[in-house]
């Protein structure tokens, strides 16, 4: 199997570095280059997503961000990685809002741009999202219950907050689901 790399959009680099180190992977980054001379819809428009990293050719990629709002930036990054001949692309995010619906993700999946999207159930997930072939729900209920129970017993939650083994297990599941 080809090696995987962790690729991150700008922001939250500490989390991406941690995950890359836990998984023993290389890491790269896309950052947004904006036009600060004008404002469109209350924001400075993105001119380009610039890439910092090594060759991704033939490698499986993990794109990490804290949340998927519309998802456009993550899908643009996925498309840019595919243009650079990346193999499979997995999108990891804590919160999947999908504010503009699921159509763009459906199309990206159908076009081979993304392979899987993983988010947690720490916010509401629509039944439509849960039925998507490309979607994996990361159920955090057990861990929230552990945290509440541990705090209720005045114990330390540090062992619960160390996700190394759980991260390894999820990645193994991704590779065995093919």
Task: Annotate each language-model stretch with its function.
Residues 2-7, 178:
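Short, small-residue-biased leader/transition segments that mark boundaries at the very start
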Residues 11, 15-132:
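PRPP/pyrophosphate-binding module of the type I phosphoribosyltransferase fold
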Residues 35-41, 170-177:
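Amphipathic, soluble alpha/beta structural segments
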Residues 100-173:
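Acidic, metal-coordinating catalytic segment for phosphate/diphosphate chemistry
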Residues 6-11, 136, 140:
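Catalytic cores of large soluble enzymes that bind and process phosphate-bearing ligands
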């Amino acid at each position: 199997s080809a090696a995987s790399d962790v690729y991150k959009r700008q922001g939250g680099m500490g989390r991406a570095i941690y995950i890359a180190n836990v998984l023993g992977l290389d890491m790269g980054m896309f950052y947004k280059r904006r036009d600060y001379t004008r404002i469109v819809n209350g924001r400075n428009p993105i001119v380009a997503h610039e890439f910092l990293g090594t060759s991704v050719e033939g490698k499986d990629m993990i794109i990490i961000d804290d949340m998927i709002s519309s998802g456009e930036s993550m899908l643009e990054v996925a498309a840019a990685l595919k243009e650079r001949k990346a193999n499979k692309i997995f999108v990891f995010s804590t919160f999947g809002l999908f504010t503009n619906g699921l159509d763009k993700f459906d199309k990206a999946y159908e076009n081979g741009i993304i392979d899987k999207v993983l988010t947690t159930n720490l916010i509401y997930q629509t039944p439509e999202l849960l039925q998507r072939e490309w979607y994996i729900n990361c159920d955090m209920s057990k861990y929230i219950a552990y945290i509440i129970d541990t705090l209720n017993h005045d114990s330390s939650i540090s062992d619960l907050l160390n996700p190394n083994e759980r991260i390894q297990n999820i990645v193994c599941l991704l590779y065995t689901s093919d």
